[in-house]
Amino acid sequence: MKDKSIKVLEFNKIQEILKNYTCTKAAKDIIEDLKPYDSVYEVREHLEETKEAFKLLITKGAPPFEGVYDIRNGIYLAEKGSALLPGQLLKIAAVLRCARRFKEYINHKEEEESYRVLENICEGIFSLPKIEEEIFNAIEGEDEIADRASSILYNIRRSLKEKNYSVRDKINSLVRSYSSYLQENIYTVRGDRYVLPVKVEHKGAVPGLVHDQSSTGATLFIEPMSLVNLNNEIKELMLKEKAEIERILTVLSAKINANITGVKTDANIVWELDFIFAKAKFASEYNCTCPTINDEGIVDIIEGRHPLIDRREVVPISVKLGEEFTSLMITGPNTGGKTVTLKTVGLIHLMAMSGLMIPARENSVISYFNNVFADIGDEQSIEQSLSTFSSHMKNIVEIMDKADENSLVLFDELGAGTDPTEGAALAISILENLRKRGAKIIATTHYSELKAYALRKEGVENASVEFDVETLRPTYRLLIGIPGKSNAFEISKRLGLPDYIIDFARENISNENIRFEELIQNLQEKSIKAQEDARLAENLKLERDKEKKKYEEKLEGLQKVRDNALIDARREAKNIIKEAKEEADKILKDIRQLERMGYSSDARRKLEEERKKLKDKLDSIEEKEIKTVHKGEALKNVKEGDEVLLASINQKVIVLSKPDNKGDVLVQAGIMKITANIKDLRAAKGSNFNINSSKTKKSKKLNLNLRKVESSVDLRGMDAEEAIYTVDKYLDEAYLGGLGEVTIVHGKGTGVLRKTIMDMLKGHPHVKRHRLGEYGEGGTGVTVVEIK
């Protein structure tokens, strides 16, 4: 990629903006060296990393870059074996912490979206939490070592504190004793030693060592002789403290040296992540999207914006190239935005090929080019005595030497600066040569000959920048398929040039040229009208979609209200059923209690009648609930092997027998075999009948009719194996039937059958608890089971 083109397209300004989003000097240096990558694979990977970082910013917020530093100098010194300063060690620990936290930041649950490229980068992080912890534990600030850094340092500092207290007590006493000889009744410190400010005329009155003199010479700072030994002890402790601090720093630095590979790797990854997230922050700030990348020369920029133009003023442009045509000729008046269009296309390509998201709409397409050549602006060189034309031509010669089918070439005012006829002919020749090589070209021009060239040459298309003649201002919108016109006569007329001069000028233009310009104007007007109609249609569609979404949300809300009401009603019905069944079980217990107490069978009969009425009422409620949940007609006939829906438990079952004369059939639900009536069977249609399986499981034991399951089972006369099978089957039916308590009659006999049944009940999934019958229930001849 030519450095000159990169400079002309102002990619360096994008780099400077990008640096503002970094946290470290190292990341800024990465950006300084940023250039388009050498392969389409690299471009896609670096765009993907930017896209992933962009998503993470949205979903997880700011990355953990707090307190991250450029530690290259510290790493260099540690690698050489030097002892690092506390601040350098702290910064290294901060970078290690950042690397460790980043692994946590990028971690995601299985069901969440993964971040392939960033996860691959973070896999290289060593994570050195022990070193990180030791440094943070030992160092509290840039120049402050913590007491807890070592037990030796702690003891030294404690002794130092005690000595300082002793010296201060002693010197305060001396201040009071020598107060008449002192400049002020205070003590001070000179060279880490406690001294008194003695008036120079009384220096003989305070025996001691002179350490300093005031600037006026009126005061001598004297260390009293009685403090010399104490001050010496303090000085010794301070030297020991310094030596211990140096030892601690040396040990920590040695640990960095021993793990230098991990430290360097973690630091480099953190700086790379700093760079990647700077790209993502830039994309967020400039409303960028990730384009689709191809290497086939196909370009489709949708509403691209030049990132260096004020976002409140920039006009988006849409540019296509590479499919229907490979060359685009942009014509129109000066200051109309032609050059901005060239720079926008070129800069967006440089950004994308450097792994940056682009300021354009979603679904934009960018092609990977080996080279982007740009001849834009006035490159006149006074030093080299080159004219504008010569300067441009020198640049064009370089382009012609290197451009091929993998090149994007941008020409601004190709052929300008010389005789119009020769310039136009030369421009057409250059364009045609590059087109035949397969290069993709966008060129701006004033020449009508180039408009005609685009009209007659296959693979070349005209375009123009729209100009509002009413306001004499360009709109900066790009119109592909329509050649531009200079609008010189219209502009001159509106600026006040007399009509007779304009008319005379028109007479000097051939009728053919006039008709051509009128045709262009007509095409422009139609194109503008078509675009306005398209924008209006798009706005109407968006408005319609917005209204549709609003009504769909309202409908969904109403549906939720209806569903919630239905759920509440069903829940209430089930609560009634549950309470009523509990009441039925209570009645059964009352009956047994009355029997034990010796009440007449008449009382039992009345209670049984009450229980029967209650059961009938429950059955009615259950049947209504089943009908609301499972609409549809009952099956008239079934055969063995049919898969049907048993409505009472809302579950698919397999028919095992034909209906008997009462309509009862044997069906299998999972591992259980159940007798059901054909009226309770429905046609099974895929998953349509599986209405909320989680709720079904909870309601199974409530939805089976009580009248189908007896409250007791008699095992007398059965052997152990037959009894176990019978009880297991019975408990399944009792559980599904919603019975709270049942009685198993096994008789007293030898007790073998009772023991077998008791052992079985201990681990049965439907049994909450069990006990032997009480007096009046059958005693030890029965077992009473409470169902879960």
Curated annotation (Swiss-Prot):
Entry-linked Pfam families: MSSS (PF20297), MutS_V (PF00488), Smr (PF01713)
Q: Which residues form the Smr domain?
A: 713-788
GO biological process entries: mismatch repair; negative regulation of DNA recombination; rescue of stalled ribosome
Superkingdom of the organism of origin: Bacteria
Report the EC number(s), separated by commas if there are several. 3.1.-.-, 3.6.4.-
Does Iron count among this protein's keywords?
Answer: no
Q: Which UniProt keywords apply?
A: ATP-binding, DNA-binding, Endonuclease, Hydrolase, Nuclease, Nucleotide-binding, RNA-binding, rRNA-binding
As for family, the record states: Belongs to the DNA mismatch repair MutS family. MutS2 subfamily.
Q: What does this protein do?
A: Endonuclease that is involved in the suppression of homologous recombination and thus may have a key role in the control of bacterial genetic diversity. Acts as a ribosome collision sensor, splitting the ribosome into its 2 subunits. Detects stalled/collided 70S ribosomes which it binds and splits by an ATP-hydrolysis driven conformational change. Acts upstream of the ribosome quality control system (RQC), a ribosome-associated complex that mediates the extraction of incompletely synthesized nascent chains from stalled ribosomes and their subsequent degradation. Probably generates substrates for RQC.
Quaternary structure annotation from Swiss-Prot or TrEMBL: Homodimer. Binds to stalled ribosomes, contacting rRNA.
**Name of the protein this chain belongs to:** Endonuclease MutS2
Q: Which gene encodes it?
A: mutS2
